[in-house]
């Protein structure tokens, strides 16, 4: 995650933080650069600054880059098996692991007709629904998909002891061997060892191709790796045999394993001579034999090289300020994407959500519409009588499906103090760091805010709640584990709210130091010890020639920097945001004017991560859940408040607002009463007008 200070770039993951050096501060808007200069400056941010920047690039890497439109078609009923990495481009561990994944894909490139290495970015808006379908909670997640799978499956989880390249490569081989005979990829040769009798029969036969036999120990994977390396080559067959029969090996002249015994087309045979008995030497030797050449295998066409033509206008910001838009964008991603990866919540997960929302509702220093939404969510969750809830019910409330006036949370991601030089750097982790720092400061400066919540006498309330959230829900699993280790070491030593502020600051700087130079570090925002001297000169001192911190001044600075008085609403979206048909938010009108119309749509940071309409149908909920939700909405809206009429709910194919529906009901009741009154009125009058006929007496 990234430091809430906008001065130190803190890495993605629980360790990344924002750092801006003064010399790199963008020029003030007042300069009014001509459009051409603005575009040139934006392009100078780098080729990866556009929304299309990803960890893996189709056409450049050996990795098969999948998305929501291709993943099911690729893995369903495929003639090859698949190993897919579901990752998030903001995840620090995912960024650090990307070179290993690229190297793995290149290393097993020749295996592609049997098993393919792919990746899918769950951070991209278009992919979030499919990641939810595949039940992806944490990043990176590795899933195997067998060949010829006809029905939808979420795949098999990677079960290796670690994620080193060799380990993953060996588990790929195990996965291929676990295929049944009928479901094994057609291009995959048999990987089981042959018996000595089979070797003798091969020696006696002549053919039109070479036969290579790799002799190895039972625990070795080298033979199977060489077999798979030679899949795309014709005029050669590779198999393997174990070293169990020592006498047989001596007869062939095999004195050590691994060794490769080659049978030539003319019937001659013998050991091949390589410098080192390694996979690369064996495979290279066999590929270079006369008449051994690559054959044409039917492979799906991989996407062409991506062209990144997007230009993103840099949002200027003051590194000494905190921006509401960063906090609200983080809340949007947290509530609508990260938590939404869990289809339902129960037990400890539900308790963690309730406590986290309680802390947010009481301490979040943002704008009133956002605070009101958090308060509504907190009261509703607190009143639930259920032990398990579907998360779609929470989404309905967050998305304001009941159209309550006065509540709003942006459905856009837009980073300002958390923007990175590339789209996969900083962003959400930075926002989460800022949010946590802000909550610790609010708990200290407004101690009465938590009265009545059960947290009022707990100086560790924010830290422990944050700790449980990161451990339970934060997408970067490895980052969460690192944070848990730090919490176990010293979080229990926190005895006051001020100590909580300093504890989080120290741990954040510790993470900064650990991740400095990591691939997840943004070169434009290096990870430094924060606050830097230019932001807080009084925070730094020197004792006996050694630089140190003045923690008293640091505490004062943190309270000022993360205090509500330091929050700026610049760039923040309003309920009438342009994406929803209203006016532009402050700061955006000029930005739109400076951005060329033909590329203005390319800024992924300003796109909706998950529009309410894409959230899927609302599940059938228990009646008590509906009543609880409706009751809380009414109580929060107030007795005299009215519901918005701008948002309409579809009914029989026609859009009716809440007011329209209410008027229909009133009109229906009034019409029914009127008809009943008229019916009785005419019935009584008909009796009064009725003529009585008397029969004559006889």
Curated annotation (Swiss-Prot):
Residues 421-530 form the ERV/ALR sulfhydryl oxidase domain. Residues 34-178 form the Thioredoxin domain. Expressed in pancreas, brain, placenta, kidney, heart and fetal tissues. Weakly expressed in lung, liver and skeletal muscles. InterPro entries: ERV/ALR_sulphydryl_oxid_sf, ERV/ALR_sulphydryl_oxidase, QSOX_FAD-bd_dom, QSOX_FAD-bd_sf, QSOX_Trx1, Sulfhydryl_oxidase, Thioredoxin-like_sf, Thioredoxin_domain. Its main location: membrane. Binds 1 FAD per subunit. Residues 610-622 have a biased composition (Low complexity). The chain crosses the membrane at residues 662-682. FAD binds at residues 426, 433, 437, 478, 482, 505-512, 527, 530. Residues 586-607 have a biased composition (Basic and acidic residues). Its cofactor is FAD. Catalyzes the oxidation of sulfhydryl groups in peptide and protein thiols to disulfides with the reduction of oxygen to hydrogen peroxide. May contribute to disulfide bond formation in a variety of secreted proteins. Also seems to play a role in regulating the sensitization of neuroblastoma cells for interferon-gamma-induced apoptosis. Belongs to the quiescin-sulfhydryl oxidase (QSOX) family. This is Sulfhydryl oxidase 2.
